[in-house]
């Protein structure tokens, strides 16, 4: 009798223990962090991992979300593009995360995207990209081309009188598509083929001598020349060093970069870079109270007052706060409900004002041009008068000029053809 009773008691105790574990597991809301912590993109992405950890920590200090603590789950896709898809699946299926913040390169995003669509999860992508995409499961808080590349070219043309153009990029989808858009845009402005030079290099490229020599020659033929750079990752370090080595100053041939910010400059000798430009939607030097508080919080969290902030960090900050607001409004972390609740959410950005999530899953943001200073910071030399709405499909490519995106129900289409009146999907 006692033996049978003890057996039942043991079974009951085990059941309670297992049940308790289930309750505890469901007691947190899991946030996936999918940024490269090793490989060629670690120079840029490691900081974004730390940014999300800071935001999770701050939210937990406010009481968490829906009465639960947030739990960050960090993985390292190691700058290996197929591994991004594997790690995304691991986060969603095995770790049961409710949202993922991750990616930098477009090839990493393209690798992950089918996984998020298959499993109907949510990805916040915080980096400027080439556009030509709108997915139900991705929220793009970085700049589309009309929020960075096009305004930068306008600035060079209108303010600096640039007539010849070097479009230099890393050899993958973001630079190639962005430069395709820019080439079409430049030609629409009357720039001829002979005044456009296009060059691509692999990730991690280190020998820039002959390429920079070609750029120097191209810029010495009588017309004011600029380089529009979509070079990504650690290849930027030897690129700028070679510019300095060949005596190319910002007055001779200015470079405007779309993937060089404070983080990349923090590890470089900036003496040869002074006066060159970058186009972003945020700089650490922005003079607002919100930015001052963000920088202070960052230094406190990272325990290093020398660490910088940059544009993708702000995009992560905006995306995280949008997600928190949408989950709060929806009263659940259910992906379908949160996707619907995100449209129309407006949160403060760090440049002043509010950024809004649009039906095409892009946001409104200001556009800033900054000039590199000798301390690795940027002096803001130009900015848009208001916020610019992100455009998923470029007006300057014939195949996409007729496409329109809205995920608002009942429309729910990422690529609606206004001529055929048919939806052709999202990307």
Residues covered by each model-derived region:
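Beta-alpha junction/loop-to-helix N-cap segments that form part of ligand/metal-binding clefts
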Residues: 43-50, 63-132, 141, 200-209
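Extracytoplasmic "Venus flytrap"
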Residues: 32-51, 75-82, 104-107, 171-176, ...
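Solvent-exposed, acidic/polar segments of extracytosolic/periplasmic ligand-binding ectodomains
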Residues: 29, 346-427
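Extracellular/periplasmic Venus flytrap/periplasmic-binding protein
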Residues: 86, 130-131, 137-246, 285-293, ...
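Periplasmic-binding protein-like
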Residues: 91-103, 124-126, 164-169, 222-233, ...
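Signal peptide-proximal N-terminal region
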Residues: 26, 50-72, 188-193
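Gram-negative bacterial Sec-dependent N-terminal signal peptides
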Residues: 1-24
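Extracellular/periplasmic periplasmic-binding protein-like sensory domains
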Residues: 242-317, 327-333, 384-415, 419-420
């Amino acid at each position: 009798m006692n033996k049978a009773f003890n057996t039942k008691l043991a079974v009951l105790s085990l059941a309670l223990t297992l049940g308790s574990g289930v309750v505890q597991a469901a007691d947190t809301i899991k946030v996936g962090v999918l940024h490269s912590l090793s490989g060629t993109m670690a120079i840029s992405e490691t900081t974004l991992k730390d940014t999300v950890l800071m935001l999770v920590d701050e939210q937990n200090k406010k009481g968490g979300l829906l009465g639960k603590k947030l739990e960050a789950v960090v993985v390292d896709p190691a700058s290996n593009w197929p591994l991004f898809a594997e790690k995304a699946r691991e986060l969603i299926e095995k770790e049961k995360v409710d949202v993922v913040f991750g990616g930098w390169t477009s090839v990493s995003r393209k690798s992950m995207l089918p996984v998020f669509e298959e499993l109907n999860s949510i990805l916040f992508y915080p980096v400027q990209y080439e556009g030509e995409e709108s997915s139900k499961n991705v929220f793009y808080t970085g700049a589309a081309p009309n929020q960075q590349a096009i305004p930068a070219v306008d600035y060079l043309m209108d303010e600096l009188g640039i007539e010849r153009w070097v479009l230099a990029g890393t050899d993958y989808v973001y630079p190639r598509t962005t430069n395709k858009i820019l080439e079409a845009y430049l030609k629409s402005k009357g720039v001829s083929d002979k005044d456009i030079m296009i060059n691509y290099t692999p990730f991690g490229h280190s020998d820039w001598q002959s390429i920079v020599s070609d750029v120097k020659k191209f810029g010495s033929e009588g017309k004011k020349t600029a380089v529009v750079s979509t070079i990504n990752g650690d290849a930027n370090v030897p690129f700028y060093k070679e510019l300095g080595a060949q005596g190319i100053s910002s007055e001779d041939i200015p470079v405007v970069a779309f993937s060089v910010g404070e983080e990349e400059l923090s590890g470089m000798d900036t003496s040869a870079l002074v006066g060159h430009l970058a186009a972003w939607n945020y700089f650490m030097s922005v003079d607002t109270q919100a930015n001052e508080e963000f920088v202070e919080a960052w230094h406190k969290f990272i325990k290093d007052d020398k660490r910088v902030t940059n544009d993708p960090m702000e995009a992560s900050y905006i995306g995280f706060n949008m997600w928190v607001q949408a989950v709060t409004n929806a009263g659940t972390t259910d992906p379908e409900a949160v996707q619907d609740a995100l449209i129309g959410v407006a949160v403060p950005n760090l440049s002043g004002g509010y950024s809004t999530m649009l039906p095409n899953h892009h946001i409104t943001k200001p556009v800033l041009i900054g000039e590199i200073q000798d301390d690795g910071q940027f002096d803001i030399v130009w900015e848009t008068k208001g916020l610019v709405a992100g455009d998923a499909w470029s007006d300057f490519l014939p195949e996409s000029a007729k496409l329109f995106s809205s995920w608002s129900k009942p429309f729910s289409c990422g690529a609606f053809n206004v001529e055929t009146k048919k939806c052709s999907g999202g990307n």
